Regions:
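A structured, mid-to-C-terminal "fold-capping" secondary-structure block
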Residues: 102-186
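Amphipathic, non-membrane alpha-helical segments in soluble helical-bundle scaffolds
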Residues: 2, 28, 32-39, 62, ...
Length: 186
């Protein structure tokens, strides 16, 4: 089943994501950097509660200051002045938090579009959706659990993050695909 979903994801990447990412890479560097900064800044909102749950209070504090600085001085996070001040924030999610509490990774499988994961990380993704302040703020109250209840701004930010990541890794993915005997096993 996972190989079949992996093949579907490869087709999705080849037909949609890779061509969009290659066009995205033609944009001026400042736009791409700003997009990456913006989506990373939004993702910081999810890292903060996970740092707290992990007992990493210094990291939570740094992430909070980074978000505040980048959202104001960095104009909604398109700039990253916090980095110049020494704030480097790593991403944390609920799957990692569960791992710090001793929850094992569990079985490996591949999700459509989202890609490879483990049972723990899949549960973490669901929890992250509920913990993500940006998701909560942009979802319609009456349709909280339905994708159709999602506002386009939330979906657009997630899609921009995926395109930015894919754009940054076009060469790496092409090399991996070209040099792998079995891409699924890679």
């Amino acid at each position: 089943v996972s190989r079949g979903i992996f093949s579907f994801n490869q087709g999705f990447d080849r037909i949609i994501l890779e061509p969009v990412a290659k066009q995205y890479n033609k944009l001026p560097e400042k736009i791409k950097t700003g997009t990456g900064n913006f989506t990373s800044n939004i993702a910081t909102l999810l890292s903060i509660p996970n740092f707290v749950l992990q007992g990493e209070f210094k990291q939570a504090s740094d992430a909070t200051f980074s978000f505040a600085i980048n959202s104001t001085v960095g104009i909604l996070g398109f700039g990253n002045p916090a980095r110049a001040l020494g704030f480097e924030v790593q991403k944390e999610d609920l799957g990692q938090t569960l791992g710090t509490y001793g929850v094992k990774g569990g079985c490996y499988f591949v999700l459509p579009i989202l890609g490879p994961t483990t049972a723990r990380d899949a549960i973490g993704m669901i929890g992250d959706t509920f913990m993500d302040p940006f998701a909560t703020a942009t979802w319609r109250e009456k349709e909280f659990l339905s994708v159709s209840g999602s506002r386009p701004d939330y979906i657009a930010v997630k899609a921009a993050g995926a395109v930015d990541f894919r754009g940054d890794n076009v060469v790496n993915f092409d090399s991996l695909e070209k040099n792998s005997i079995d891409l699924y096993a890679s």
